[in-house]
């Protein structure tokens, strides 16, 4: 139930708030999509993963492919950092 509500909040952001600003996420998937996938895969710990990802996403970040890892981690998924 809480997971569904958190995902609803992120989707609300994606549909109603995000379009008002230029795209700026340096990662794939985007930070909001990453948050949804992390919540689906890791439950409430996924929220922490999503927040850590948002904090990593800044103009000096290298960006690139950073999928949600299969195990809980607050660090970047380094399976494919060649992008």
UniProtKB/Swiss-Prot annotation:
NCBIfam families with a match to the protein in the record: membrane protein insertion efficiency factor YidD
One Pfam family, short name: YidD
Record organism: Streptococcus agalactiae serotype V (strain ATCC BAA-611 / 2603 V/R)
Reported function: Could be involved in insertion of integral membrane proteins into the membrane.
Membrane topology: Peripheral membrane protein
Superkingdom classification of source: Bacteria
HAMAP family found in the cross-reference section: UPF0161_YidD
Cellular localization per UniProt: Cell membrane
Entry-linked PANTHER family: MEMBRANE PROTEIN INSERTION EFFICIENCY FACTOR-RELATED
Keyword Membrane: yes
Record's keyword terms, sorted: Cell membrane, Membrane
Annotated family: Belongs to the UPF0161 family.
Protein name per its UniProtKB record: Putative membrane protein insertion efficiency factor
